[in-house]
């Protein structure tokens, strides 16, 4: 197996709202990584690209949409996403490409533009929850993070103040990172005083939503050695996914991280990680998550090692176990897919002596980066190492400042040309017989489970297979008691989109272990009829159902769980075996649903020039000095050579008259509804330029327009639907 090294890195600034399009952000990071590696795009054999949920951009298969900016045009190309775990999964995929011997070099790119999504980027996470059993409760990631944080605190005895120390350290470390979005000198008191979102989570416990991109170049040993500098090797990789049924396990310990770490350690020859690793970059979207993930990386289910290190100050940049010297997601920012790759880049800087003011104390020869994603289930881990004495390289990166990095921060998308999109997507999700049986239980005022004899588990929600017993078929179903015990809870002040609830209103979400189903077989739902101050882990509760004539066979037929009264504790009811529902065309159920997200897309650096020209009735392109061509429409990068371009400084005027080279007559809108009149959509090419422009053709002629000479129609409207042409003459 070929050894694989990181030989170059690039990144944009991480910002709340970027003017650049996703492709422009990716191209900026790629150009920097190629320059750092001393290579051109022609030297790259393959490209791996990571972006997280498509719901952030509202563009299906978003990776393919920005392939040009990622340098993947006409190259072997792979796109993948596992939520926040993507940024470490991406270099793992790139490592596979090179380690296999098939490729000598691989460009790894991770990009995320979260800002287009409204009413808030966090609202996009509604799409990762089960559409039938969880989305109706209007959960968001803040809620399940808060549930996990509360369980973590309960299991390991942490206080909120102790956890807040992580946020303080990481934000301070970020003061020295050129890409950092929110570097700050704050105190534990500042964290504790910040706005409460969903107890125990406060504003300063959380990383920001971000736009940004990161790229690295991977190379075989032969290519890396030929560069004449000490390589930084990928020594071990690991990746594991746990079940999406996140209420079926104790949230206190990240088993998926520990398993991935064990795989990486075995590959790297590590037997004592606490002694053999010099730099730690765990994923830290919330401050408690850094400690949570460190428990997994140290393979310590007791949590004593991490607590001891925290109390000793070992996680400081000058400590014995420096954690997130970069500043992590909490300080640098969290453009979901790109965050993990930022951590990989940090290890490259640290282990090659290029980290500048962020360089950890002592010689660092080995580091570990880890990322996490989706429903608290993804673990991705990479171990990296250098060889020989630590080289201190006075590179560009050693002295880089924020103003040296690309990435244009906006106060508002409305400040630049942009396009609004309201998809209004609707769905009908089929249930199948197991889920139908489960939901019919709600209609009957019952909590139902399926039983696996292989592992002796009552499974909630009921399912036709066991995910831990080799997909063993399950055909036994039970009605369970509608009582249980609170395993963890959160008192929320925000809704599904992370927007404030009405004044005085809170929602209390809890994971309830249902009686008869085991300690860690929980059901997430609301609590009611209880003072928030009286809620605690271990609280005994009972379901409160809607009146029978109002039930619809949905999880919301259970209104909430209330505290169980002492006089109701007269012996636990036993599970009762039932027959599963037999499906027919009449009884087969489905769940209607809608994804309530809207988008506002910036036109980008190239688009800003294009729409300014359009308003004046003119057309310009962008000159690429490397390829010696004019690109149309205006562009911030050249798709062929990945050279960064300035659409303003390198603008070249073009004749606004062009020739139609392709056309189609459209009779329906994008939703399939008939148009009042058919519309010609044409592709137009222009003399002395590479590329073309799509738009409407305004004409009364029904003849096919291919070969027709047309000109741009001036308009001040922004958006592809406003680009139009008319015949010349």
Where are these regions (language model features)?
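Glycine-rich active-site loops that engage anionic ligands at enzyme catalytic sites
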Residues: 483-529, 537, 657-698, 706
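A broadly conserved sequence feature marking short terminus-proximal activation segments
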Residues: 389-447, 549-620, 718-722, 728
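Cys/His-rich short segments
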Residues: 440-483, 612-657
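Condensing-enzyme catalytic core mediating Claisen C-C bond formation in acyl metabolism
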Residues: 1-23, 27, 32, 132, ...
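Well-ordered alpha/beta subsegment
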Residues: 516-572, 687-729
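Conserved active-site "lid/cap" helical segment
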Residues: 1-85, 93, 152-159, 181-187, ...
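Active-site-proximal alpha-helical scaffold in enzymes
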Residues: 81-112, 142-176, 216-222, 335-356
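Conserved catalytic cysteine-centered active-site region
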Residues: 53-109, 113-144, 183-208, 240-242, ...
């Amino acid at each position: 197996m070929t050894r694989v090294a990181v030989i170059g890195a690039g990144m944009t600034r991480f910002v709340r709202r970027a003017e650049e399009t996703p492709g422009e952000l990716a191209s900026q990071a790629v150009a920097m990584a190629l320059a750092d590696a001393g290579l051109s795009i022609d030297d790259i054999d393959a490209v791996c690209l990571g972006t997280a949920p498509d719901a952030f951009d509202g563009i299906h298969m978003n990776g393919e949409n920005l392939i040009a900016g990622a340098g993947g045009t006409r190259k072997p190309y792979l796109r993948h996403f596992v939520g926040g775990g993507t940024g470490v999964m991406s270099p793992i995929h790139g490592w596979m490409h090179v380690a296999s011997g098939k490729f000598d070099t691989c460009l790894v790119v991770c990009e995320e533009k979260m800002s287009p999504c409204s009413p808030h980027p966090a609202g996009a996470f509604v799409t990762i929850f089960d559409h039938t059993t969880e989305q109706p409760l209007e959960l968001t990631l803040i809620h399940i993070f808060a549930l996990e944080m509360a369980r973590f605190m309960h299991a390991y005895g942490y206080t909120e103040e102790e956890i807040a120390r992580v946020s303080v350290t990481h934000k301070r470390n970020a003061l020295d990172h050129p890409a950092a979005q929110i570097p700050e000198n704050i105190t534990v008191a500042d964290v504790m005083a910040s706005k409460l979102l969903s107890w125990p989570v406060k504003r300063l416990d959380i990383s920001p939503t971000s736009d940004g991109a990161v790229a690295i170049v991977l190379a075989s040993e032969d290519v890396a050695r030929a560069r004449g500098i000490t390589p930084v090797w990928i020594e071990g990789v690991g990746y594991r996914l746990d079940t999406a049924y996140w209420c079926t396990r104790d949230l206190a310990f990240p088993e998926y991280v520990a398993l991935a770490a064990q795989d990486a350690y075995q590959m790297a020859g590590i037997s004592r990680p606490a002694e053999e690793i010099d730099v730690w970059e765990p994923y830290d979207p919330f401050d408690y998550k850094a400690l949570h993930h460190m428990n997994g990386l140290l393979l310590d289910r007791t949590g004593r090692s991490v607590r001891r290190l925290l109390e000793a100050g070992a996680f400081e940049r000058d400590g014995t176990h420096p954690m997130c010297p970069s500043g992590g997601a909490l300080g640098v920012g969290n453009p979901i897919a790109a965050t993990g790759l930022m951590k990989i880049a940090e290890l490259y800087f640290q282990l090659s002596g290029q980290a500048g003011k962020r360089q950890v104390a002592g010689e660092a020869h080995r580091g570990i980066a880890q990322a996490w994603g989706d429903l608290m289930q993804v673990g991705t881990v990479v171990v990296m190492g250098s060889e020989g004495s630590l080289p201190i390289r006075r590179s560009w990166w050693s002295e880089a400042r924020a103003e040296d990095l690309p990435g244009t921060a906006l106060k508002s998308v409305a400040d630049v040309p942009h396009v609004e999109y309201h998809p209004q997507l609707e769905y009908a999700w089929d249930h199948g017989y197991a889920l139908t049986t489960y939901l019919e239980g709600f209609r009957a005022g019952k909590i139902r489970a399926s039983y696996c004899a292989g592992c002796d588990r009552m499974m909630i929600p009921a399912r036709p297979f066991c995910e831990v017993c080799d997909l063993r078929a399950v055909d036994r179903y039970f009605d369970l008691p509608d009582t249980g015990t609170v395993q963890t809870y959160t008192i929320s002040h925000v809704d599904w989109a992370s927007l404030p609830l009405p004044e005085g209103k809170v929602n209390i979400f809890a994971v309830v272990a249902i009686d008869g189903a085991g300690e860690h077989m929980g059901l997430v739902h609301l609590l009611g009829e209880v003072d928030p101050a009286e809620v605690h882990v271990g609280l005994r509760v009972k379901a409160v159902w809607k009146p029978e004539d109002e039930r619809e066979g949905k999880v919301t037929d259970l209104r909430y769980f209330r505290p169980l009264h002492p006089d109701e504790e007269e012996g636990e009811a036993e599970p009762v075996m039932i027959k599963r529902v037999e499906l027919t065309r009449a009884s087969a159920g489905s769940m209607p649903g809608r994804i309530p997200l809207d988008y506002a897309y910036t036109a980008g650096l190239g688009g800003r020039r294009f729409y300014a020209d359009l308003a004046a009735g003119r057309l310009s392109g962008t000159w690429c000095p490397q390829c010696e061509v004019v690109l149309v429409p205006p562009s911030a990068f050249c798709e062929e050579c990945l050279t960064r371009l300035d659409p303003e400084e390198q603008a070249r005027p073009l004749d606004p008259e062009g020739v139609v080279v392709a056309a189609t007559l459209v009779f329906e809108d994008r939703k399939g509804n008939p148009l009042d009149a058919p519309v010609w959509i044409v592709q137009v090419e222009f003399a002395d330029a590479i590329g073309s422009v799509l738009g409407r053709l305004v004409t009364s002629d029904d003849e096919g327009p291919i070969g027709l000479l047309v000109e741009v129609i001036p308009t001040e409207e922004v958006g592809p639907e406003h680009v139009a042409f008319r015949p010349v003459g």
